[in-house]
Amino acid sequence: MEKFGKYMITLLFFSTIFSYALAQKKPNVVIILTDDMGYSDLSCYGNPLINTPFIDGMAKRGVLATNFVTTSPTCSPSRASLITGRYCTRTDLNWPVGPGEKPCLKDSEVTIAEMLKPAGYATACIGKWHMGDYGTALPNKQGFDLFYGMLYSHDYRAPYVQTDTVIKIFRNTRPEIYRPEDTTLTDLYTKESIKFVNSSAQKKRPFFLYLAYNMPHLPVALGAKKSGLHSAGGALGNVIEDMDHSMAKLWQALERNGQADNTIFIFTSDNGPWLNAPKRMFEDGITQAYHIGTAGIFRGSKGISYEAGHRVPFIIYYKGHTLVNTVIRTPLSNIDMLPTIADWAQAKLPAYTLDGESVKDLLSIKNYHKLHKPIYYVNRVLEGVKEGDWKLRITTNDGKKLKEMYNLSEDPAERVNLYDNPVYKTEQEHLVMLFDQYPG
């Protein structure tokens, strides 16, 4: 009996060790989100002046997508969709939210952080939040153990925005830095991210880091004055190259901790460049139109449901899982991130309707072919739908409806409107049907 007892204790001990070892194999997740970055703002996406060696290197290690879109062309809605896997009309955040404004991210929404926490993940939101500044909308109430950053954009100050709110860097719910200098933001966020990685690795916990940089959202002129920045791409290039250098430091921290090979690395932007920025953004005497990013051949701007507002850089790397040095031209969207992460992490999905789909197989299997379900473009209200190569856009201006249809494989710049062209009647009828079936 004594021997049997010892045997059971030994078995229990090794079972515990085995279970713990399995827990450590859960992949870490790092999502790096830039602000208002244009499709063509990185050297790996064709920019001839801005040098981004780190992110270019990650694209060579993994996958670069040329047809990745955000489901909304503005900040708060896009971020809400990314972090919940749902269209913004479900989350109640269909427009950028200001200080104290309603609505904000609903308590009933399940974020990536809330999905991963039951699986033992440490979670951190570092950088720009912009999904609500009170109550249950705060990051610590949305599944994040740590919040370090600001609740809005860094332009929420005079002369850019007329508000009584003072920009602050918070540590969880307590202000820590008042009126932070633009030159310090990227460094502050990166250092805090490295601390979080170090701490999680020491505790042997899988972790989720959501790192949302403020740049290159206007203004960039002040941030670009940081010592040591001399990009051929000017002020815009300075802040982007600064982020690239900072991401390299973060990756080195992952390597030092032996975590790089077990980390899902995702890089993207919340929406396209603010090419139609209002006059107030230029009243500081130093901001120039050429400080705004570019969207290459794509038409439109942030805040507009043409491709430039939605189509953004997307790079993903997960050693041994993602394809290597591969360009994917299949349509993808930011709402696909939550289900894809759940698939890799074997996390339980939220018990309600998700709009995104897991694209793990597309990112992992060479020559994988499966039609992505329709992707909807929501700009406060539903304005478009894309399936495969075809996109339908329906907008209302002064009570008049404008209906547009484009074959994006042949006309990515959306120059030739094929709506009501009898040659494409079948495609038009199909897209109109999909538009009317918007699930959000």
Label the model's feature ranges.
Residues 2-7, 22-397, 401-404, 408-440:
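Formylglycine-dependent sulfatase
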Residues 9-17:
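Bacterial N-terminal signal peptides
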